[in-house]
């Protein structure tokens, strides 16, 4: 029984590791905000080397009350931030989270973050896979 349980656990771990290894996160950064700012934004490039789409559904960070997926776009001549339930990273493709496009919005920072600080994130995908990311706080990209 113990051997079967161990085999099952190793098999499950290998599936998670395989799913996680098809996604790469590059150039993760958080824009430094003015003192007493109640909202911050994060950017990064998500690269999917897998044969199927990867769907980002949730992001968490201990540095913020919560993290939201957003997309900036112009609607009827007015720039707006639109909440996204998910961000699809196509198979063998990439999505850049950048100013004026997809990005992470983070309200309620736990403390003031300044250039040189680092912020930890956990990205969760629709298949249950997670990826840990550490982003640098910068004044400019």
Model-flagged regions — what are they?
Residues 1-4:
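Positively charged n-region of N-terminal signal peptides that target proteins for export
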Residues 6-9:
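Sec-dependent N-terminal signal peptides
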Residues 12-18:
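N-terminal signal peptide c-region/cleavage motif recognized by signal peptidases
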